């Protein structure tokens, strides 16, 4: 399973800022915490659209950058695309978490999958104490159309992800303009980590994953997840790759990997 995490904005395309916090800085931190938590689950590979403050596709518009980020994630085999953002409002009273999902006008299953994923993540965020806002889709306001003639989504994340056949969602974690959200979650590492872990937990529930555990006996180490254990396969655990033999024991030292060659 490949999960694409997209820290929204960057140093070129800055996001919202208020109360001493900046969106493009914090979205990267939240995504990094989410990545670390997701990698505690066996069989999950995380693709990050950016790992520094820099724009991954400089020299163009924000829409071009987003389109390329999604294309890169799809090329990496991503099954879902989760874009991390923070909200802002003219009203300092506005607070809480909301998530934007694909519409169901074209490739409706993508929209349905996006709603399922968003519902699970929103539930985890609300469980932290964030105010529950809405999960919604937004259609184009300039009559743009998908291939089937239906109205397209408004945001590039949803449009590009849908074109690649994967659900793209925008998670607006909290408001930079609300002092309660900022003090509880955004101006401290503990709060940012809670947000990232909540995102990861929702994603894991979407895929039906459970955390595994290492065990050791007289023969060696093995890794169990739920009622089953890994065997005869490679697995990425906590960001590192391991190979488990036919009996489920972790191999050590150099291993010979046979690669098939074919023509096309």
What do the PLM-derived regions correspond to, one by one?
Residues 1-20:
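Short glycine-rich His-centered loop
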Residues 2-4, 168, 244:
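Hydrophobic "anchor" residues on beta-strands that sit immediately upstream
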Residues 7, 101-103, 173, 225-226, ...:
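Pocket-edge structural micro-motifs
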Residues 11, 176, 247-249:
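Acidic glycine-/aspartate-rich tracts in secreted/extracellular proteins
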Residues 13-14, 49, 257:
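A short alpha-helix capping/helix-coil boundary motif
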Residues 21, 25-210:
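Active-site-proximal helix/loop segments of hydrolytic enzymes
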Residues 209-264:
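Extracellular adhesion/carbohydrate-binding repeat motifs centered on closely spaced tryptophans
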């Amino acid at each position: 399973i490949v999960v694409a995490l997209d820290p929204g904005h960057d140093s070129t395309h800055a996001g919202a800022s208020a109360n001493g916090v900046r969106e493009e800085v914090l979205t990267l931190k939240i995504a990094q915490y989410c990545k670390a938590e997701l990698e505690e689950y066996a069989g999950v590979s995380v693709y990050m659209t950016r790992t520094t403050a820099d724009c991954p596709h400089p020299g163009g518009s924000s829409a071009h950058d987003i389109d390329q980020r999604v294309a890169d994630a799809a090329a990496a085999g991503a099954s879902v695309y989760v874009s991390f953002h923070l909200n802002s409002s003219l009203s300092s009273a506005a607070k809480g978490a909301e998530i934007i999902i694909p519409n169901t006008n074209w490739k409706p299953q993508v929209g349905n999958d996006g709603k399922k994923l968003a519902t699970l993540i929103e539930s985890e965020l609300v469980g932290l104490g964030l105010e529950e806002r809405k999960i919604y889709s937004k259609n184009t306001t300039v009559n743009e159309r998908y291939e089937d003639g239906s109205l397209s989504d408004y945001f590039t994340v949803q449009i590009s992800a849908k074109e690649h056949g994967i659900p793209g969602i925008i998670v607006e974690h909290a408001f930079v303009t609300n002092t309660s959200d900022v003090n509880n979650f955004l101006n401290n590492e503990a709060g940012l980590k809670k947000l990232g872990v909540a995102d990861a937990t929702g994603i894991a529930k979407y895929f039906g994953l459970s955390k595994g555990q290492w065990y050791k006996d007289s023969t060696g180490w093995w890794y169990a997840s739920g009622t089953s254990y890994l065997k005869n396969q490679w697995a990425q655990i906590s960001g590192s790759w391991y190979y488990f033999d036919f009996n489920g024991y972790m191999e050590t030292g150099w291993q010979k990997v046979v690669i098939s060659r074919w023509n096309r």
